[in-house]
């Protein structure tokens, strides 16, 4: 940074100081946009507050001197104004607040005990006064399952947010940590709830079953955590179950999830005799006493029969840490033993850097060893200041900008979830930078509209606690803000936007209509609400049949919405047979030369397009989206007409010629053509391209693609033959089988079309003891006979409509 820029920055800083003192909006806006080597004068402002003092309350000469000193340091050392440097120099109160904040999610395979574990967390932190179980066995149900359907079915359908304070003993005294927690669904049909939770969280607890270990949805959750770079600790639950084998689960984390993992604990007993754990770092035995395990008892007396195992597992922990942390590696190579503090610091570093996951174990249902998991959340998961969160600066071609969890900086937040409540739309927001205050005006980066925040609440499942302000790094909900999921909000001075969450495409559809016309209004309200709340739930009206079509992630997903419509809106509906989301593609290169020519007196239509269609070779992730390219030379087609050609191509790909389903893996090139001085128009070229596409597509040996689902089935070993028979009837491809002492797990790619009704057949084949889960894997060519039937049925339906 040149000294000229430093001088300009100091001047900007001084101007900003006056603006902040006088709260002049225009001056403040200019201040935020002052150029200081791409960092903006706002960092200079912050720099002038370093060292825990608000230097803007001092004289102008001192203020400018402090700013100049900071900026001169930045000129010599660019790292002086990095996020880390700012965090290191926050005032003591702000630094201490951030250090004690944890934003975490609990995620796992279905029925691994997420909600049960969350219930214990809330009880042990004093957030609830009594423990209630999943499925509403005591007519109350778990706190985080607030929907009636969740309590009936015993599954989590919507992610639920809460907050609590955990008193952790550090250096002989209690330290209070503030935990924002989101409990997520385990069923793949509700995967969007996991996606949007992990998008805004700083860390996670991945729960595994001590018997089943890594399961299909565990692998999906692992993939989602990697997508958003979320550090995790692992908690092996259900240690009291018959067949519990925690070290097998640790081995599966290493092998199947391919992330280095090591146990921090050894169980004291197992199955019915599970009684506590040995902490391998401090080498202490930990027991839970009291009616609900609320009293923690620690002792130096490790059971004699476990001493050798504990020594082996502690050595393995140190060896694993040496592979992922340089400091422990040096100690290990010097054949020394790391101290407790060195081990904990190394686990924290490696976990936050996504190089390692520490593994704890316990039984939430038996009220054992949940508190040590809470200690691990505080010890090993990051606080908001330790996570890199990026925004995109619209002024600089969407260059990434680091956000800093500091209350004094301009506000930046992300709306990640919407819910309808009795008081209107409830919008969940993660505050990444600055603070959000009641009555504050914020700007939606997508719509460029200003909105006022009338009310801020903290959520405790379905209960609300109103607050006047939320600080940086926190999660809250607001009322009265019209927005979409994934919208970025700022204070108006920063042209920032943030990337949204990944939204998978639906794989199943069905037609739906109210049974009576008088329910039409409520039916429309329900459709609009469900679409706003859930990005994976799609609604459209078929242009030809005029039927309302809903699409989602699976049968259960759509069944839940149909049931919610009946319960929440009192609308009885009729649904059609579920329809698979097929795709279409070509397999051969086809050249086209098509002319559209219409003359009806006066101005006519004329457009000639020349080029070719060709298949895009499927990659490791399957069929790619269809693409368009123009290679016209000599100006035979003008740019505006080429743009119309592309629009025609994209419109054609939305509704393919074979079945009316979207087109994948097809590349169109327009390399020549002709225009007419008066008869050519954008509409003519769009129509000509669509006609050329349809004709060429049918000449390119087209195929129907069907979705294949990665299906995981678990059942007792005696039913293995029955299940293999069921899959063979469906032409499934078995990719993996794992046989345990009692149960086996089978993984196969199955056609979604063949899986309708599989649930009832599986129950019959396993006497109700089998379970299965599906998630979308990839598209593949459908069997030839099925393709013929589908095309024939589609053509017949089209002909019938034209007759009408």
From Swiss-Prot:
It is found in: Mitochondrion. Residues 99-385 form the tr-type G domain. PROSITE patterns: G_TR_1, G_TR_2. Coiled coil: none annotated. GO terms for cellular component: mitochondrion. GO terms for molecular function: GTP binding; GTPase activity; translation elongation factor activity. SMART domains: EFG_C (SM00838), EFG_IV (SM00889). GTP binds at residues 108-115, 183-187, 237-240. Pathway: Protein biosynthesis; polypeptide chain elongation. Its main location: mitochondrion. GO terms for biological process: mitochondrial translational elongation. InterPro entries: EFG_II, EFG_III, EFG_III/V, EFG_IV, EFG_V, EFG_V-like, EFTu-like_2, G_TR_CS. Mitochondrial GTPase that catalyzes the GTP-dependent ribosomal translocation step during translation elongation. During this step, the ribosome changes from the pre-translocational (PRE) to the post-translocational (POST) state as the newly formed A-site-bound peptidyl-tRNA and P-site-bound deacylated tRNA move to the P and E sites, respectively. Catalyzes the coordinated movement of the two tRNA molecules, the mRNA and conformational changes in the ribosome. Belongs to the TRAFAC class translation factor GTPase superfamily. Classic translation factor GTPase family. EF-G/EF-2 subfamily. This is Elongation factor G, mitochondrial. It comes from Botryotinia fuckeliana (strain B05.10).
């Amino acid at each position: 940074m040149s000294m000229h820029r430093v001088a300009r920055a100091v001047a900007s800083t001084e101007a900003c100081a006056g603006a902040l003192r006088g709260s002049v909006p225009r001056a403040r806006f200019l201040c935020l946009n002052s150029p200081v080597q791409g960092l903006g004068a706002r960092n200079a402002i912050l720099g002038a507050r370093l060292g825990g003092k608000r230097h803007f309350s001092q004289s102008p000469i001192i203020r400018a001197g402090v700013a100049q000193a900071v900026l001169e340091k930045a000129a010599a050392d660019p790292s002086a104004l990095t996020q880390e440097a700012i965090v290191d120099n926050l005032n003591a109160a702000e630094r201490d607040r951030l250090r004690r904040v944890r934003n975490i999610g609990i995620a796992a395979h279905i029925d691994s005990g997420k909600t049960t574990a969350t219930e214990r967390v809330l009880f042990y932190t004093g957030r609830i006064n009594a423990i209630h179980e999943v499925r509403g066995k005591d007519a109350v149900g778990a706190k985080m399952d607030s929907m009636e359907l969740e309590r009936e079915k015993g599954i989590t359908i919507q992610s639920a947010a809460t907050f609590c304070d955990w008193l952790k003993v550090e250096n002989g005294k209690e330290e209070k940590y503030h935990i924002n927690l989101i409990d997520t669904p385990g069923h793949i049909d509700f995967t969007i709830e996991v996606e949007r939770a992990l998008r805004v969280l700083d860390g996670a607890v991945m729960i595994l079953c001590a018997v089943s270990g890594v399961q299909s949805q565990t692998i999906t959750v692992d993939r989602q955590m990697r997508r958003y770079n979320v550090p995790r600790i692992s908690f092996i639950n259900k240690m009291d179950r018959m067949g519990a084998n925690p070290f097998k689960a640790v081995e599966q984390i290493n092998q199947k999830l391919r992330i280095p993992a090591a146990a921090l604990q050894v169980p004291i007993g197992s199955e019915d005799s599970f009684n506590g754990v040995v902490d391998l770092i401090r080498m202490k035995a930990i027991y839970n006493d009291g009616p609900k395990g609320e009293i923690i008892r620690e002792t130096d007396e490790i059971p004699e029969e476990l001493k050798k195992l504990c020594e082996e597992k502690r050595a393995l922990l140190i060896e694993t840490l040496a592979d992922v942390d340089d400091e422990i590696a040096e100690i290990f190579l010097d054949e020394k033993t790391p101290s407790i503090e060195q081990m904990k610091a190394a686990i924290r570093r490696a976990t936050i850097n996504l190089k390692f996951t520490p593994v704890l174990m316990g039984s939430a249902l038996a009220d054992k060893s949940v508190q040590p998991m809470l200690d691990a959340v505080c010890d090993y998961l990051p606080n908001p200041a330790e996570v890199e969160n990026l925004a995109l600066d619209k002024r600089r071609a969407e260059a990434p900008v680091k956000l800093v969890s500091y209350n004094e900086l301009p506000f930046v937040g992300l709306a990640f979830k919407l819910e309808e409540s009795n008081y209107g739309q409830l919008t969940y927001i993660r505050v990444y930078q600055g603070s959000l205050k009641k009555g504050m005006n914020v700007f939606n980066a997508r719509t460029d509209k200003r909105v006022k925040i009338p009310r801020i609440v903290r959520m405790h499942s379905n209960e609300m606690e109103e607050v006047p302000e939320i600080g940086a790094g926190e999660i809250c909900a607001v009322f009265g803000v019209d927005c979409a999921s994934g919208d970025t909000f700022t204070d108006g001075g920063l042209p920032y936007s943030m990337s949204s969450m990944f939204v998978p495409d639906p794989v199943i559809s069905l037609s739906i209509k109210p049974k009576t016309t008088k329910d039409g209004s409520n039916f429309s309200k329900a459709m609009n609400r469900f679409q706003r709340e859930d990005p994976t739930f799609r609604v459209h009206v078929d242009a030809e049949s005029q039927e309302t079509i809903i699409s989602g992630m699976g049968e259960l997903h759509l069944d839940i919405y149909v049931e919610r419509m009946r319960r929440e809106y009192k609308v009885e509906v009729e649904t059609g047979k579920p329809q698979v989301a097929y795709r279409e593609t070509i397999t051969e290169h086809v050249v086209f030369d098509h002319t559209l020519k219409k003359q009806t007196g006066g101005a006519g239509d004329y457009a000639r397009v020349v080029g070719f269609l060709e298949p895009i070779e499927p990659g490791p992730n399957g069929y790619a989206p269809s693409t368009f390219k123009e290679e016209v030379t000599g100006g035979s087609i003008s740019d505006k007409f080429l743009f119309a050609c592309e629009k025609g191509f994209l419109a054609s790909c939305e509704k393919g010629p074979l079945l009316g389903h979207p087109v994948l893996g097809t590349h169109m090139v327009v390399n020549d053509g002709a225009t007419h001085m008066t008869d050519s128009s954008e509409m003519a070229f769009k129509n000509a391209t669509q006609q050329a596409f349809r004709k060429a597509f049918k000449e390119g040996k087209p195929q129907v693609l069907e979705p294949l689902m990665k299906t995981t089935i678990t059942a007792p070993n005696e039913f293995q033959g029955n299940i293999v028979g069921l899959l063979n009837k469906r032409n499934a491809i078995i990719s993996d089988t794992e046989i345990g002492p009692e149960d086996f797990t089978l993984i196969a790619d199955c056609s979604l079309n063949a899986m309708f009704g599989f649930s009832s057949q599986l129950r019959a084949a396993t006497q109700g003891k089998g379970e299965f889960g599906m998630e979308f894997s990839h598209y593949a060519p459908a069997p030839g006979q099925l393709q013929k039937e589908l095309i024939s049925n589609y053509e017949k339906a089209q002909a019938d409509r034209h007759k009408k």
